[in-house]
């Protein structure tokens, strides 16, 4: 019984620490290239400008845009 109690307390403590680390981290999005997106260029540009990850996406009107996802700065 004592071991089970210790394990439960450890798990609750661990989950509390994980929640504290992720709290307040919001993902922001920004379009960097509005047309003719190239995968390598998009990734590189997003990394250099915003320290994020960029991917090309096809829009409804069939354009390819570079969407950069990065941690918001406060």
Swiss-Prot record:
It is found in: Secreted. It comes from the Eukaryota. One of its GO terms (biological process) is defense response to fungus. The keyword Secreted applies. The keyword Secreted applies. GO terms for cellular component: extracellular region. Pfam families: SLR1-BP. Keywords: Antimicrobial, Disulfide bond, Fungicide, Plant defense, Secreted, Signal. Residues 1-24 form the signal peptide. Disulfide bonds join 28-72, 37-56, 42-66, 46-68. Transmembrane segments: none annotated. InterPro entries: DEFL (IPR010851). Belongs to the DEFL family. This is Putative defensin-like protein 128.
